[in-house]
């Protein structure tokens, strides 16, 4: 394919136009009074969204050079979303300002390389200062971060905080579309897997068709059990103690299963058999997880361990086990042991090392089950358009909350960046020439998010920034008041701010040091009738297939024969 080339100021000018086109579409969404963007779809109703990445991915510009600029800014939004889950519009606003100021200075003769060095030094200092300013998050602060990220929706904030409280930070929290109008939180407590009882005769509650035991012992093995002789020692032990026994094995069958059922129905034993979850190596990993969770030992063929020699100390313990026809849920005791923490850390290391999405999904599931459960936020809304928009907001809020727990919180509304910008004055004094100019570009860029939040709320951005500096308080765009944002619960996750700033300067520094842009030459328009012309003319072209042997026979079934 032929290529188009653009050089120097012309190339940078085209890139800047693309940057501005995309950034201007995104920045109207920032802040509590950010506006929506309507996106036409080829099929179905238009989407009404408030999510930066979703908007960015929909934009393709006609000019190929401008489109490259737009796609570079889309990359900023996507990278920030991928790593932090939120802050995409903040990153875009920062990048746009840095690009505009950087290109203005290079056009005036500044060295783009020295500008970049100055900008990178400034961002490095801001990141260090941000870490010092961050505060750990807990309690109500979790709800406040989620509420702010959800556009001020307190219902969503409370729901996310409740979900994290119930399943812990390591637990899995997913967002799904609901079939009802209401948005609800559904929590599965404990470790659940999709294997039920081996026989319906193990049922303890005839009305609900479940088998449920309080404080049972659990025998965990990857063996197939056919002979009751293998189980007699452990059965005698639990019978003396009077505790229920769950046998979790690859399979319990034949004589062993029949004997267990008979003794259960006679009231001699409180017992149930369950097939082990998953298959192959994943089964061994799952059984190992259950052993760690319950404080038991996995009786494994790989370790040459024998069922006849099982001791009471080898059995796992749980607070409650509920078994249905298709699933089993183990609610562990509250005591969190070191072995469990180490197991979770080990799985997290595996997660970092794998690139397979399937493996990542399964590893995350294992972490969640060990950590205490799974929470599902089921999103409801009157229309499909509102449902999609609400789902995106909840996902952003959930991601921002996780980021806040990881690296702490700071005052929101762009105020923290504004405060940190004041510390760049000393750095600028230590530098000279274009590096100093680069620092000053970052210092001014850090005011851009606050200005845009104010503009979207109907205020003058420059006046708001000036008032914040004068009063020493943050700006609540929802009410138009100047308050202590930490006390008011208007918070941002430090991780989100850090990544937004780092991703913005990364792309901006690349853009201002660009000298040549290469783009694909657009395809010439199709000749009339070749595409999109008379539909029957197009059918005529198919007539050429008549010469293809057997296909020619199908020609007899053509339009003339049907007349």
UniProtKB/Swiss-Prot annotation:
Short name of one Pfam family: Cpn60_TCP1
Query: Per UniProt, where does ATP bind?
Result: 29-32, 86-90, 413, 492
Kindly list the places in or outside the cell where this protein is found, as annotated in its UniProt entry.
Cytoplasm
Reactions mediated catalytically:
ATP + H2O + a folded polypeptide = ADP + phosphate + an unfolded polypeptide
List the GO cellular component terms. cytoplasm
Q: Name the EC number(s).
A: 5.6.1.7
What GO molecular functions are on record for this protein?
A: ATP binding; ATP-dependent protein folding chaperone; isomerase activity; unfolded protein binding
Annotated keywords? ATP-binding, Chaperone, Cytoplasm, Isomerase, Nucleotide-binding
Q: Source organism's superkingdom?
A: Bacteria
- Principal cellular location given in the protein's record: cytoplasm
CDD domains assigned: GroEL
Q: Does the keyword Cytoplasm apply?
A: yes
Which InterPro entries does this entry report, sorted A to Z? Chaperonin_Cpn60_CS, Cpn60/GroEL, Cpn60/GroEL/TCP-1, GroEL-like_apical_dom_sf, GROEL-like_equatorial_sf, TCP-1-like_intermed_sf
User: What PROSITE patterns has UniProt attached to this entry?
Assistant: CHAPERONINS_CPN60
Please list the residue ranges that the record marks as compositionally biased, kind Gly residues: 530-541
UniProt KW GTP-binding keyword: no
What are the boundaries of the region Disordered? 520-541
Q: Name one GO biological process term.
A: protein refolding
Relate the protein's function as given in its record: Together with its co-chaperonin GroES, plays an essential role in assisting protein folding. The GroEL-GroES system forms a nano-cage that allows encapsulation of the non-native substrate proteins and provides a physical environment optimized to promote and accelerate protein folding.
Q: Which HAMAP family match?
A: CH60
The Swiss-Prot or TrEMBL record describes its family as follows:
Belongs to the chaperonin (HSP60) family.
Tell me the subunit arrangement: Forms a cylinder of 14 subunits composed of two heptameric rings stacked back-to-back. Interacts with the co-chaperonin GroES.
Question: What is the designated name of this protein?
Answer: Chaperonin GroEL 1
């Amino acid at each position: 394919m032929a290529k188009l080339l653009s050089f120097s100021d012309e190339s940078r000018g085209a890139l800047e136009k693309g940057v501005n086109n995309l950034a201007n579409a995104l920045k109207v969404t920032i802040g509590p009074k950010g506006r929506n963007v309507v996106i036409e779809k080829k099929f179905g109703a238009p989407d009404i969204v408030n999510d930066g990445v979703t908007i960015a991915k929909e934009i393709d510009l006609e000019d190929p050079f401008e489109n490259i600029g737009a796609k570079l800014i889309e990359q900023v939004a996507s990278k920030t979303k991928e790593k932090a889950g939120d802050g995409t519009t903040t990153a875009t606003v920062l990048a746009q300002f840095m690009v505009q100021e950087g290109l203005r200075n290079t056009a005036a003769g500044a060295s783009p390389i020295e500008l970049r060095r100055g900008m990178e030094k400034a961002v490095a200092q801001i990141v260090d200062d941000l870490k010092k300013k961050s505060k750990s998050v807990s309690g109500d602060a979790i709800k406040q971060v989620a509420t702010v990220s959800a556009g001020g929706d307190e219902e969503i904030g409370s729901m996310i905080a409740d979900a994290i409280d119930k399943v812990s930070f390591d637990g899995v929290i997913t967002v799904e579309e609901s079939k009802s109008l209401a948005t609800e939180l559904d929590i599965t407590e404990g470790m659940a897997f999709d294997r039920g009882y081996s026989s319906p005769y193990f049922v303890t509650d005839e009305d609900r068709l479940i088998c449920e035991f309080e404080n049972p012992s659990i025998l965990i093995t990857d063996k197939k059990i056919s002979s009751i002789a293998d189980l007699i020692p452990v059965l005698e032990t639990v019978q003396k103690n009077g505790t229920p026994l769950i046998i979790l094995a690859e399979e319990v069958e034949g004589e062993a299963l029949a004997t267990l059922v008979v003794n259960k129905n006679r009231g001699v034993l409180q017992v149930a058999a369950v097939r082990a979850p998953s298959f192959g190596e994943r089964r061994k990993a799952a059984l190992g997880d259950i052993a760690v969770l319950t404080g038991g030992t996995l009786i494994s063929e790989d370790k040459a361990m024998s069922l006849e020699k099982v001791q009471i100390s080898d059995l796992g313990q749980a607070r409650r086990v509920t078994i249905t026809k298709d699933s089993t849920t183990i609610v562990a005791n509250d005591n969190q042991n070191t072995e469990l923490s180490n197991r979770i850390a080990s799985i997290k290391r595996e997660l970092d090392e794998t690139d397979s999405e399937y493996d990542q999904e399964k590893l995350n599931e294992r972490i969640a089950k060990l950590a205490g459960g799974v929470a599902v936020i089921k999103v409801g809304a009157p229309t499909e358009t509102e449902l999609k928009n609400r789902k995106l907001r909840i996902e952003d809020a959930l991601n921002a909350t996780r980021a806040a727990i990881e690296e702490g919180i700071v005052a929101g509304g762009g105020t923290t960046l504004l405060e940190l910008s004041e510390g760049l004055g000393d750095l600028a004094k230590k530098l000279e020439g274009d590096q100093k100019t680069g620092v000053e570009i970052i210092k001014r860029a850090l005011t851009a998010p606050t200005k845009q939040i104010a503009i979207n709320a109907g205020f003058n951005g420059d006046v708001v920034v000036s008032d914040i500096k004068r009063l020493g308080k943050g700006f609540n765009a929802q009410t138009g008041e100047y308050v202590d944002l930490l006390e008011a619960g208007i918070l941002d996750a430090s991780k989100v701010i850090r990544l937004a700033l780092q991703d913005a300067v990364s792309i901006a520094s690349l853009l201002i040091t660009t000298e040549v842009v290469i783009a694909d030459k657009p395809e010439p328009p199709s000749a009339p009738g070749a595409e999109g012309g008379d539909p029957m003319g197009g059918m005529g072209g198919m007539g050429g297939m008549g010469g293809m042997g057997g296909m020619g026979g199908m020609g007899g079934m053509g339009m003339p024969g049907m007349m």
